[in-house]
Structure formats: C-alpha cells, structure tokens
C-alpha cells in the first residue's frame, strides 16, 4: 500500500519515537525529508540525521532524537500543508508558532527556511509544518 503523505508519516514516526523514549528513529528516504531532518538539526530539535539503509536494502534516514533532562526537546510537531489542502502564506502572513517559541517550516524559493528567516528574506511559501 502506498503512503499518501510521507512528510506526515515522518512527523508521526518522530512523535511516536519520542513518546516511546527511543534514541533513534528510521524514516524512508526522500530528498525533502532529508532537508526537513537537516532543518530540525540546525534548529536544535534533533541531535543528528544520516542516510542509511534498511535490512531490505532500501535507503532510509536515521534520526537521532534529542532529550533535555529526560523530556523530549520536541513538545509538538504538526503537519500543516498536506496533499489534499496546500497552505501558502506571504511573508507578512506567516504565523508565529507558540508566540515565537516554536518554529514554522516554510518551503520557499530560497529553500526550506524557518518562519523568522522567511520574514527576514521577505519571501512567503508553503507551510510544511510546525515544531515547538
């Protein structure tokens, strides 16, 4: 059976791994998911990510989850724009997640950036998801 929304699946795997207090989570590989994983590393929400392979030989992304004092660093990770309903915003209309505490992942013409950086660059785009 094919996966309808691979990014939502990635977010769910991360959320489930955090609730089960796992150290690593394996996600099927795609370029956009690797970009999102690198974004989460740069923003400090996960420790690291690397490309690997499953036992079946399929490419995957190994995500090392991050905890602080035993609690997950990611309190909330949520998919916003989805295949059946894409959400696009201009730089002026980009939302502040948790009053600026969290970050919105925005896909722009300048690549995958945070809502703060998109506002600074003056570009809008598709809101992939929220992380806090």
UniProtKB/Swiss-Prot annotation:
PROSITE patterns per record: RIBOSOMAL_S8 (PS00053)
* Keyword Ribonucleoprotein applies: yes
Question: Gene Ontology cellular component?
Answer: ribonucleoprotein complex; ribosome
Q: SUPFAM superfamilies, per this entry?
A: Ribosomal protein S8
Q: Which domain of life is it from?
A: Bacteria
* Keyword Ribosomal protein carried by entry: yes
Q: How does it assemble?
A: Part of the 30S ribosomal subunit. Contacts proteins S5 and S12.
HAMAP family according to UniProt? Ribosomal_uS8_B
The record describes the protein's role as: One of the primary rRNA binding proteins, it binds directly to 16S rRNA central domain where it helps coordinate assembly of the platform of the 30S subunit.
**Name recorded for this polypeptide:** Small ribosomal subunit protein uS8
Organism this protein belongs to: Francisella tularensis subsp. tularensis (strain SCHU S4 / Schu 4)
Q: Which gene encodes it?
A: rpsH
